[in-house]
Amino acid sequence: EDNSSLMEEHKKKNVVGVTYKTVNVAGESGDASPSTPIGVNLPNANWIRASIGSKSVSLGNIIHAYNNSGSSGRLKEFANDDQEYDLEIEHGQLGDKLHTALHEVVGHASGQLNPGVGQPKETLKNYSSTMEEGRADLLGLYYLYHPKLQELGLVEDWKSVGMAAYDGYIRNGLMTQLIRLELGADVEQAHMRNRQWVSAWSYARGKEENVIEQVKRDGNTYYNINDYEKLREIFGELLRETQRIKSEGDYKAAQDLVEGYGVKVDQEIHAEILKRNEQFTGAAYGGFVNPELTPITDSEGNINDIEVRYVNSFEYQMMKYAENYGFLVED
């Protein structure tokens, strides 16, 4: 908190009660299934965060599954060069894990509201979710490219990990996440919006100095980071502004940032991305098959064990859910 790029009046004076754990989940339900988040940070109330603290949980086996579920073909297609590809292969998973941890633990826990300012859901309204996710992302990005990570023993090569993380964030925010959208659609989901407005604003902010370069080669578009140090400064500048928006409850600034950079999609690039992605069979979103957990009881009904059995397929799971738990009345 003390070393972040936030304005002094927006920094917590006394950071308390920040805890972090990684757990493996046996199954999920509700809005966490079949497509799940990779981490959870609570509480949502900022006054509780300020006075008591916050707790973060990363879902370790979920992160591992996401990282190992796809091939490297899509990366090869959208990475600008061999260096970007090799950095992602060697350091990308660790960079992603660290970004998730920094996002959840430090990002959501950082900063404070100005006295008398309401909760973001009241002041920033429909932009509160994407603004908060972007703010947490930016805090993580700001510290991902820093030697302190190596001093703490978290990485062996902080610069390579940071470069891989920055490459991946820009590549996803400006290109690869667009495979989830139909051509002509706006970006609606809060996390997708925040990744786009963070990336697009940073690209625009550094355009004069060519910090991030748009490369056209053989009819394809790529993005290449020419100056990682400068990009970190830009992330810090945007972090400072997003915290100001939250701390002051500046709805107009949030609206301008999100609508200006996070909603509309460059249709020409979008069409190109979808065309280049046609060669890959992997789905745009990941879904999970939950095991069936059956209690094993003794003659008195006491549970002695749990039998874990996986169903035949994702499709079978969803049909069984509809059969057993589809309680909505159909006309």
Region locations from a protein language model:
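Contiguous, non-catalytic segments that form substrate-binding/exosite surfaces or channel walls
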Residues: 1-86, 92
